[in-house]
């Protein structure tokens, strides 16, 4: 694992590790196998959530993220870029929602999740129309 800096963000590091081991042939043949592995890891996470052991939950959650990162590699998606793009989109939509609610003279802290969700859906539509 030499050549993979320890200081990298975890998702970037996982991606680099997977690229590195691919170079020596330790890799899946196709994306279907990777998807199946991801589903297996999700099932293992569900089991640990039911048991309630936080250490095991964190471990299995990490396995899910690692498998999902590997799947991203197979479908030619940079997971770091994809997550950052989603973060930015979420922030923009949330800001639109906040503004809509503020313009109506309402306070988000006094709204139910169901009420906020109506504004969230409006914000999504407004964002998509830009």
Question: Where are the language model's segments positioned?
Answer:
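Flexible "arm" and connector segments at domain edges
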Residues: 1-61, 65-130
């Amino acid at each position: 694992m030499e050549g993979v800096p320890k200081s990298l963000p975890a998702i970037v590091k996982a991606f680099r590790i997977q690229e590195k081991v691919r170079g020596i042939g330790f890799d899946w043949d196709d994306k279907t196998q990777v998807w199946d592995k991801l589903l297996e890891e999700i099932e293992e996470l569900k089991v640990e959530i039911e048991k309630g052991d936080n250490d095991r939950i964190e471990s299995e959650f990490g396995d899910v993220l690692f498998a999902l990162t590997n799947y991203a590699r197979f479908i030619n998606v940079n997971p770091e870029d994809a997550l950052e793009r989603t973060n930015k989109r979420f922030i923009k939509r949330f800001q639109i929602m906040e503004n809509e609610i503020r313009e109506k003279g309402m306070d988000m802290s006094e709204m139910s999740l169901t009420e906020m969700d109506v504004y969230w859906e409006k914000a999504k539509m407004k964002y998509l129309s830009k």
